[in-house]
Amino acid sequence: MANQEIARRRTFAIIAHQDAGKTSLTEKLLLFGGQIQVAGAVKSNKIKKTATSDWMDIEKQRGISVTTSVMEFDYHDYKINILDTPGHQDFAEDTYRTLTAVDSVIIVVDGAKGVETQTRKLMEVCRMRNTPVIIFVNKMDREAKDPFDLLDELEEELVINVRPLTWPIESGPRFKGVYNIYEQKLNLFQPSKQVVTEKVEVDIHTEDLDNHIGTPLAEKLRSELELIDGVYPEFNVDDYLKGELAPVFFGSALNNFGVQELLDCFVEIAPSPRPVQAEEREVQPEEPKFTGFVFKITANIDPNHRSCVAFCKVCSGKFTRNTPYLHVRHNKTMRFSSPTQFMAQRKTTVDEAWAGDIIGLPDNGTFKIGDTLTEGELLHFKGLPSFSPEMFKYIENADPMKTKQLNKGIDQLMDEGVAQLFVNQFNGRKIIGTVGQLQFEVIQYRLENEYNAKCRWEPLSLYKACWIESDDPAELEAFKKRKYQYMAKDRDGRDVFLADSGYVLQMAQMDFKHIKFHFTSEF
């Protein structure tokens, strides 16, 4: 029973550059899972209904995702857990952490723009973890690059072998559909349908194909399919599972075209939950005892209640409601009477969850990102880094009557990992560090709308925040004295050096040879 439940789980993230169509694809997958009746248009000028996975007010207003949302549904005999991640580069850290909680990834690429910066960075994280990748080339109903040029670009930019499993017949206004190489079926395109398009079984070597798409396109398709067989490696599931080969699908998420082929193939070939590396040992999903780690914390999923939810990935065994589990960092036992599973902000209480599932645990400040829960074993799961921010600003209270609300808001948003908080040792002022400007706007907006607190920003020109440590306590003290005005503490009380230029950092590294300067911290 346990092994069957684990084997039917598929936990994956959808990642891409901003505007490639991740959230549209998520919506259509939910449509097939029967979770929503009509998919919301993501662009803000077409608001029939906002996207299901964009649940914060700011996401609905701007038509972008600013936080990872978790959704689960059943499809055929499989239990699917989707994590829709922000594509905007300012929220990359949320996405990096999400990749530690999934077993495979679907990368969405815009057919007209090809591989973009953010996609490249996220693929590096997938490569580091040998995560299996499927690529969906989206927006084929608009003018797109030549599909062979796209395949070359994917191989070169993402450093992975590719094999198309569906193939487009033209693009833009001439787009006729895709040929499903995997199932040897022709799928004809009908725009703006919320339902599945018609599939026709055709032998591509007969006139049947010509009757459906016309002789010129049929001839072109036959020669392209021959070229594919000659140039690209045979699709091999083992190579895909090792992260060495990426199957490629073409379609249009907004028009719900090519999505079902992607989903059907995905559930068949994608891995069930994989082993997870802890500092002490490798944890196998089939182990009878429950283990899990917190990879994300979200405040105010329900704005009527100032509640936080810790997202926990079940790594092994079975989680049961109201059972005592050990919170390893605090070394204390906790019970959870209302663990939840999600459909964006709609949540339902669950009695049990298996390896591969993502559950939400109510959090009143107990959890931090990276915390481990077990049945008693002292385990620490690895690989939840926090990167040195790129931008820094002082945060000031704009309404002295709301100091308490502001402090609570900052604490909860920092728990989420939205940004990082440092306290300057020289003047005691709070500094917020982020990856991009948009995060400052999101923090200000959420403080005002969710905590009724106002803040203002004061610019601060810094180059990097470096976590420092040394085996020589005397040298560490000497460094902290000399650089006193540049020293800060992070939320865990660790020493951070705020270098205001690359030159200052270089000189510090030369003058203090026994001090280690780190650009990432483990949470």
Name the predicted role of every residue range.
Residues 1-523:
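Structural and coupling elements of P-loop NTPases
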